[in-house]
């Protein structure tokens, strides 16, 4: 759930991060229809709540975790919020909680390698979405700094297969 001030080319990086988190929740909640409008609303509301502390003091330890979103959803009155929180629970407290930690990837290195080969079937799509988000954050930060970015994807066909 990492974000930086250059995350978006627009004035509001939080709007783009909220869109990413909606996509993440769409994968987690699943279903043919995707997220319902009320679910999207409570997720968006909670995203703004959990990032408030970080934007007041943008230090790595204040970066929100998936668990912060989960806890914020549990405080909402709408039953849809509890439905989304229940779907997130396995990714927060359960056996698929691999992404509920601060990142150990130093995105500021000249070369960054993301290896998601060992992710199981349940985490593969989520892992690819998170990698794409991290790459986007790096590309926008580099663009703001006037740097070019090269992006190499091995096994690129896996990205297309995940969306089928």
Model-based region annotation:
Residues 2-163:
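P-loop NTPase motor domains
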